[in-house]
Amino acid sequence: MRPGAGANPSLPDDLVEVGYVGGAYGVRGWIKVQPHGDAEALLHASTWWLKPAAGAPAVSSDWRVLPVGTSREHSGSVVAGSPAVPDRNVAEALRGCTVWVRRAEFPAPADDEFYWVDLIGSTVVNEQQETLGTVAGLIDNGAHQILRIVDEGGTERLVPFVEVYVKSVDVAGKHIVVDWGLDY
């Protein structure tokens, strides 16, 4: 379930999980966040929502709104300070929380780039207009991304998200055209 969809009426409907708190950074209450992917959304957002990890010690079960004062990249992580986290003990208590950002605060992607969250739920058809299914997720294999497409019967197809196979993407219309047969 998306965070704002009935989970808590005060949560925005467009929250996207972008990382998790790895622990405290320094002695002044900064936190260290491991991004799930590109750190741009974390660096661009002015507010983060923290959701406690299941079974996380010393953290309330409620979401926490965290205004971001300063953030920067540091050795593959993002470190950030917030007026809501005054010292290292408070920062350390947030370890394990997942970090969520409003989709509206993501920086605009380049013309030929897409956020995974925008592709999930898209209908995928081939060039013959045969429906392959719906994008259920994406996989990064190190060389490129792979669309995980599931049809109505539960059959899963994996289609490389590369130009040779992906012919068009309409993010607003949630529609992707691929050069991929039903029998692949």
From Swiss-Prot:
Disulfide bonds: none
Record-level GO cellular component terms: cytoplasm; ribosome
Primary localization: cytoplasm
Domain PRC barrel: 111-184
InterPro entries, A to Z: PRC_barrel-like_sf, PRC_RimM, RimM, RimM_N, RimM_N_sf, Transl_B-barrel_sf
Pfam family, one: RimM
UniProt-recorded Gene Ontology molecular function terms: ribosome binding
Keywords: Chaperone, Cytoplasm, Ribosome biogenesis, rRNA processing
Subcellular location(s) of the protein: Cytoplasm
Biological process annotations from GO: ribosomal small subunit biogenesis; rRNA processing
Domain free text: The PRC barrel domain binds ribosomal protein uS19.
Function as written in the Swiss-Prot or TrEMBL entry: An accessory protein needed during the final step in the assembly of 30S ribosomal subunit, possibly for assembly of the head region. Essential for efficient processing of 16S rRNA. May be needed both before and after RbfA during the maturation of 16S rRNA. It has affinity for free ribosomal 30S subunits but not for 70S ribosomes.
Homology family: Belongs to the RimM family.
UniProt xrefs under HAMAP family: Ribosome_mat_RimM
NCBIfam families for the chain: 16S_RimM
Quaternary structure (record): Binds ribosomal protein uS19.
PANTHER family, per database record: RIBOSOME MATURATION FACTOR RIMM
Name by which UniProt lists this protein: Ribosome maturation factor RimM
Organism: Ralstonia nicotianae (strain ATCC BAA-1114 / GMI1000) (Ralstonia solanacearum)
